[in-house]
Each structure stands twice: as C-alpha cells, then as structure tokens.
Swiss-Prot record:
Protein's recorded name: DCD domain-containing protein NRP-A
Skewed-composition ranges (Basic and acidic residues): 38-50
InterPro entries: Dev_and_cell_death_domain, NRP-like
Coiled-coil blocks: none
DCD domain location: 223-355
Biological process per Gene Ontology, one example term: response to water deprivation
PANTHER family the UniProt entry points to: DCD DOMAIN-CONTAINING PROTEIN NRP-A, PTHR46034
Species the sequence originates in: Glycine max (Soybean)
Superkingdom of this protein's organism: Eukaryota
Subcellular location: Cytoplasm
Amino acid sequence: MDNNNDFWKFSDQLRLESGLANLSLNDYSIWSNSYSSKRPDQRRNFDVKGSDFNNNNNSSKAFDDDFNDGWKITNSNGPLFSMPHNNNNNTLEVGGFNKGGGIYSNTNTTISSYHPNNLNNNAFGGFNKGIYSNTTSSPYLNNNHHHLDDNNNLNRNNLKGYKTYFKGEDQFHTPKSAKKKNTTNNTNNKKHGDNTNNNDGTKTGAEKKFKTLPPSESLPKNETIGGYIFVCNNDTMAENLQRQLFGLPPRYRDSVRTITPGLPIFLYNYSTHQLHGIFEAASFGGSNIDPTAWEDKKCPGESRFPAQVQVITRKVCEPLEEDSFRPILHHYDGPKFRLELSVPEALSLLDIFANQNSFDDIFKAIPA
C-alpha cells in the first residue's frame, strides 16, 4: 500500500510540474507547442504507418468549431499522460492537431478539403494535414510518397509552392528542334522523289514515278498475260509500222518485260480511236531495243518510248472501232483501259478481228 501511495503522490507532483512540457522523446518534445520552436532541420520525421489517428467516422461538425491548440496536458481518465479530449467532438488530425491548429498546417487549404468524406483511411492522409502539412516553405515534402498505392492521396498531396521547370510537352513529346529537323529531312527526300526512309537522293522523280504501274493498270500477279496493246498517234504510227517496233513511255518498262515471242500484239491509235491488228511479238519485251526510235531531242541517244518490243504482222485486218472492242477491255479511271490483256480478253479480240475480212480477201473478191 505504501508503494502505491508513493506512486500516486509522485504522479500528482508530475502533473503540477511547470516544466512538464519540456519532457522529450527522441530528443524533441511532442507533448506541447514547444515543438514548433525547433527549426525544420531539427525535427525528425516519424512513421505513423498503422496509426489510428485518422478517423473518418467523426462528425463533420468538427469543421465548424474552433481549433484545438495542439497536444495539451489535460486532466483525463487515463494514467499520467493521455491524448487530449475534444469536448466538441472535433476530428483529430495526426498528432492530435485539428484543422490548421497543428504545426506546419496549411493555411491556404479550404474547409471543404478537410471534410471526412475527402479523408483517406490511410494514416498518411492525416499525416500531411498534421505536423508535416503541405506548405510553401517546404516544397519538397512530396518526395517519398511512392510507397502508397492510393492515387487519391497522392493527388491531394500536390504542393502549391512547388514549381516545375519542365513543360508537359518537353517530357512527353519530341523537342521542337528535332521535329523541325525531321521535317526538313522529309522535305528533302520528297524533293528528290524518294519517298522511302533511306538517304539516297540520287534517284530522280521520273525514275521513281515511272518505275512500275499501279495495280489498277496491270494484271493481277496470279494471272497469265494473254496479249498486249501498244499506243500510238497519227504522228508516230508510220514509224511504228516502218520499224516493226512498238514502244511505250518509261513507266511501262517492267510491264513490257513480261512480253514473250509469239504473244498477240495490237496497236491502238488514240488520234482515230481505232485498234489495229493483228501483230505478233518477235522478241522479248525490253528497254531501249532501238534507242534511235522516237529519239528525244533533249537527250540524244535516248528514246522517248524506251519500253519496246519487236513485232511482225500476223494478219492485216480492218481496224476496229471503239464500240466493238471497248466492252471487252478492263477500264479504269473513266475511259482509260488496261494495256495488259488477260487470256480471255486477247482471245475475244482475235475473234473480232477474225470476223473481219482482210484487205487481201476483199481485193481477191473484186473481179479483174
């Protein structure tokens, strides 16, 4: 009994001590506002993980009452020291601080941000509203928040005083100087007629443009070529027949190479819109078989129609009018028709020519 009485006497003496506020734990006082007298670099952070200070079940009436002035020595029901009672049933922040009453409290924060519905059960949410709240004097307090998974908490912990020196477009987009440089390179490639990613600028626009025919102007790859139509006008037709050589512009070079000896050939005169036949390929299709044919005056030694093939006249027939042969051909882009003939198309044209009497037969039928 004597020991118990001595203990309670000692307890009463401690409660009356005026220097109780200076009692310290871990080299600093946590029991009174004398904690605020220390400099920020002398204050030690502490782990409130798992603490039960942040309670969301408290009444929202706490936000309309006065501030509680931090931790105070109060007469409580607990032994020696206890957490202060809040007679107004106010919500306590971490360390017992109410809204704005705690050390490093954010004076710029609105009342709505402290509503219990906005608080998080995570103790860290209350911690930032307590002694280490967000303030303009401590702009880098948000450095160690990555261990929390609550994105809502992180959003509320953004600092008003923190200023970033990088724009969003600098972090997620290509720098403007690099964009400009790439645009310049692409422009140079287009000027040289090179639409690929290589840096070879030696190709001319004509060579790139006329290398091959588009799919609409050529037969499908899995279809066999059955014949070919060459084109001329009134100025070039005589040279075609005299040289027994037909030619087309450079863009038809690859297409003409598919011609083999014995393939049916037809000649279309777009000045008269008539189709002449019947001719037969005497050579493989090639390029510049006779460079002097249709020679280009600007480039001596080069033909204006380098996609060439040698032919022989298989049968002289009356030319066909457009109405008779156009329904057979494959058309694209309006009146244009494909020069490469499939096997059915070539056979149909041969049948039409066969129904025409040759000039020789007509002359033989005339009596002398």
